[in-house]
Amino acid sequence: MADRIERILERVEKPVRYMGKERNTAVIPFTQAEVTFAFCFPDTYEVAMSHLGMKILYSILNDVPGVLCERVCMPWVDMMDALREEHIPLFSLESRTPLKLFDIVGFTLQYEMSYTNVLHMLALGGVPVKAADRGEDDPVVIAGGPCASNPEPLHAFIDAFLIGDGEDVIREITCLLRDCRKESLSREQQLGKLAKIEG
């Protein structure tokens, strides 16, 4: 898939948005992680990288033993079209892993106008858009941030909402899901345990 991605980068405006490789990014191999977390910002790379909260949570998660957090940003229209034309799923910046292969897909909801981008990112990444359509092999989709205080508009698409300060509980959530994977718990059991965590 790497060669196909390189080819489409030649066709899009601002290909640096999708290249990654910045200093201080996560370096643990994807296959060696006990649990993988796709940190999704439903806006372009430029907006995402100007957001301090994303950098803080990225650092917190990658400091947890066995956890790998990678970033995924909303592609611009030209890249969306190229991904669809070439049948390439939306991928992470660090390892270019398709969104659907992560254990956890986490969205930060900073403003309501980004809600449609959440749905676009799920669809582009090969993750069933509706929570009810997800099976045992699909990621657990969570969302936090200021707009998570009103989960109703996205409740049909998100498995669990983090209401409150993400810095306080994101480590607990990720470690819980890591342990659930070790115990081979079902999706329903995992979500049941998540529901018991206080926001």
Report the location of each language-model feature.
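Helix-enriched interaction subdomains in cytosolic or periplasmic regions
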Residues: 1-15, 64
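ER/secretory pathway lumenal C-terminal domains and tails of membrane proteins involved
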Residues: 3, 21-26, 59
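Flexible, glycine-rich loop/tail regions that form catalytic "lids" or insertion modules at the edges
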Residues: 20, 27-29, 38-41, 103
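Short boundary motifs at domain starts and secondary-structure transition points
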Residues: 22-32, 95-97, 191-192
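Residue-level signal for beta-strand positions within conserved beta-sheet cores that form or flank
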Residues: 33, 65, 137
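General detector of N-terminal leader/presequence modules that precede the first folded domain
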Residues: 35-37, 43, 48-52, 56-64, ...
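Low-complexity, highly charged intrinsically disordered N-terminal segments
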Residues: 37, 41-42, 48-59, 66-83, ...
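Glycine-rich beta-alpha loop elements in corrinoid/cobalamin-binding modules
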Residues: 74-199
